[in-house]
């Protein structure tokens, strides 16, 4: 009965070495006893007194059923290979009960199927129960993993949005720094020309005029550069003050166009300053050339007159000459 209720128990029972051979021997012993009673007292006496064969029909049917349940397990079929001839002899017996012979024939059928992948009904039911028990556990694990991954995905999305929102401001600042650097680089040539002009005009009489012109030009350049830088700084202050979250492609294009216009204005101012410095340098050079070609100075004239005049004779005393 235990073997019939559970396929695992059937496997355990079948692994006992004398189990199958003992059950087959029990049925064979009953069949031999029944054959002796039939030969001695006749078949009718055996039918009227089935207990005369040493056991009851119920016990024989129970033993045959146990063999059938053991044979249904795929792993036990190899254990019945040695008992096939004995089982076939019981099936072909004309004395044994027909129901017992039918059960044994089913045992032979299960053994003939071999050790294939086909499992018994009990084994399939056990597998279904195990799968049903594993499914809720796997569903709970998947739900827990999904619940744990959802906040991580939300945090990753928030960090991505914050990084994209914070990116436009550094671009504007770098553009402003580049523009300021370009303006400062454009303002360098006037200072260099000022140094050259001041060095060339140190030995001329027009040094004061040139220096005053250069100081005026330097003041004009500084005012232009300060105005350009102030306008640039105003633009850079107003541009980043806008909220980075609302910046769109149109606003970025407007900021870049304004920066280009400011850079163009600064370049024009620097070019005008360079032209004014060049004109001042040309005027200083012309004044120096005129001074070198013109008449000599008063100091040189007085020196020449002193050299040309001869030495005057010493004064004489009128009284002395008359006395002599």
Curated annotation (Swiss-Prot):
Keyword Cytoplasm: no
Polar residues bias locations: 179-188
Assigned keywords, A-Z: Activator, Chromatin regulator, Developmental protein, DNA-binding, Nucleus, Repressor, Transcription, Transcription regulation
Comp. bias intervals (Low complexity): 154-175, 195-226, 287-310
One of the GO biological process terms: imaginal disc-derived wing margin morphogenesis
Localization per record: Nucleus
Cellular compartments per GO CC: brahma complex; nBAF complex; nucleoplasm; nucleus; SWI/SNF complex
Residue ranges constituting the EHD domain according to the UniProt record: 1-126
Region (Disordered) location: 132-226, 287-324
Function as written in the Swiss-Prot or TrEMBL entry: Trithorax group (trxG) protein required for embryonic segmentation, development of the notum and wing margin, and photoreceptor differentiation. Required for the activation of genes such as Antp, Ubx and Eve. Binds to DNA without specific affinity, suggesting that it is recruited to promoters by promoter-specific proteins. Essential component of the Brahma complex, a multiprotein complex which is the equivalent of the yeast SWI/SNF complex and acts by remodeling the chromatin by catalyzing an ATP-dependent alteration in the structure of nucleosomal DNA.
PANTHER family from the UniProt entry: BRG-1 ASSOCIATED FACTOR 250 BAF250 (PTHR12656), TRITHORAX GROUP PROTEIN OSA (PTHR12656:SF5)
Protein name per UniProt: Trithorax group protein osa
Biological source species: Drosophila yakuba
């Amino acid at each position: 009965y235990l073997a019939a209720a559970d396929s695992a128990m059937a496997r355990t029972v079948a692994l006992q070495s004398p189990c199958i051979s003992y059950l087959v021997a029990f049925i064979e012993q009953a069949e031999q006893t029944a054959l002796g009673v039939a030969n001695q007292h006749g078949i009718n006496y055996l039918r009227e007194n089935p207990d005369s064969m040493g056991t009851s029909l119920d016990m024989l049917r129970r033993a045959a059923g146990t063999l059938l349940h053991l044979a249904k397990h795929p792993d036990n079929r190899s254990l019945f290979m040695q008992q096939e001839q004995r089982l076939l002899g019981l099936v072909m017996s004309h004395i044994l009960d027909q129901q017992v012979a039918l059960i044994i024939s089913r045992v032979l059928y299960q053994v003939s199927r071999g050790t294939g992948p086909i499992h018994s009904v009990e084994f399939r039911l056990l597998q279904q129960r195990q799968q049903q028990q594993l499914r809720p556990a796997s569903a709970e694990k998947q739900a827990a993993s999904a619940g744990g991954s959802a906040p991580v995905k939300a945090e990753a999305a928030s960090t991505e949005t914050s990084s994209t929102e914070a990116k436009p401001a550094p671009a504007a600042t770098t553009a402003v720094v580049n523009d300021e650097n370009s303006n400062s680089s454009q303002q360098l040539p006037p200072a260099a020309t000022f140094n050259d002009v001041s060095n060339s005009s140190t030995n001329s009489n027009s040094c004061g005029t040139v220096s005053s012109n250069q100081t005026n030009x330097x003041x004009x350049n500084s005012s232009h550069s300060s105005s350009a830088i102030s306008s640039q700084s105003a633009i850079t202050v107003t541009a980043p003050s806008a909220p980075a979250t609302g910046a769109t492609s149109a606003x970025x294009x407007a900021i870049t166009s304004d920066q280009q216009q400011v850079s163009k204005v600064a370049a024009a101012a620097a070019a005008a300053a360079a032209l004014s410095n060049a004109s001042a340098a040309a005027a200083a050079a012309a004044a120096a050339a005129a001074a070198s070609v013109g008449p000599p100075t008063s100091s040189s004239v007085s020196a020449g007159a002193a050299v040309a005049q001869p030495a005057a004779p010493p004064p004489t005393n009128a009284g002395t000459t008359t006395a002599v």
